[in-house]
Amino acid sequence: MVMKKQHFLLPIIASFFLFACTLDTERPTDVKYISHTDPTWQQHLSQLKKIRDYTNQGQLGYISQKERFSTRFDWQYQNPTNYRLTLSSTLSPTTLSIEVRHNVMHLSDNKGPLRSAQDAKRLLKEIVGMDLPLDQFALWLKGQPDESREYRVAENHLLAHFSYPIDNQQWTADYLSYHQLPLPLPKDILLKTEGQTLKIRIDNWTY
């Protein structure tokens, strides 16, 4: 039986609808860039690569032609085949957990298991409405680009922008602000592809 995504997301949508409506979806235009060979950037990139497992929490706003919602999220990443994304509301006990274990996606809510599938990306789109490459999400949240693709470094010596195709979709990202931790890590990220916008606000980092 195919479960409708609206059933799971309605309480989550209601709790953060205003956040979704006020998303700043415009790319910054006044950013100045520096070379990829900048020593400070290269040192930062080396430190990012040493972070193998981590967790973070925050807010996620999503806009497409068919969907518009926002939710709190909890991201727990162990390795490329084991990670979990939990969507939740502060106004109700409703949660939606998207967990990948050994490359198989398991979907559950606060009442128990719902579905499992080998095609994680397809299941995520079917149930939640987001067409998001979760296998890339771990690097994107860290601010770590694919070095073989197009990306740009800002004058603050941190990743500012990337643009490259994933699964026949051109994805662009703009890193709007960073937490000034011992290791600077992203705070606000704007992700876009054709017909989709994803605004991420990361509140907490643990690694």
UniProtKB/Swiss-Prot annotation:
A lipid is attached at residue 21 (S-diacylglycerol cysteine). GO terms for cellular component: cell outer membrane. Its main location: membrane. It is found in: Cell outer membrane. Residues 1-20 form the signal peptide. GO terms for biological process: lipoprotein localization to outer membrane; protein transport. Keywords: Cell outer membrane, Chaperone, Lipoprotein, Membrane, Palmitate, Protein transport, Signal, Transport. InterPro entries: LolA/LolB/LppX, OM_lipoprot_LolB. A lipid is attached at residue 21 (N-palmitoyl cysteine). Gene3D superfamilies: Lipoprotein localisation LolA/LolB/LppX (2.50.20.10). It is a lipid-anchor. Plays a critical role in the incorporation of lipoproteins in the outer membrane after they are released by the LolA protein. Monomer. This is Outer-membrane lipoprotein LolB. It comes from Pasteurella multocida (strain Pm70).
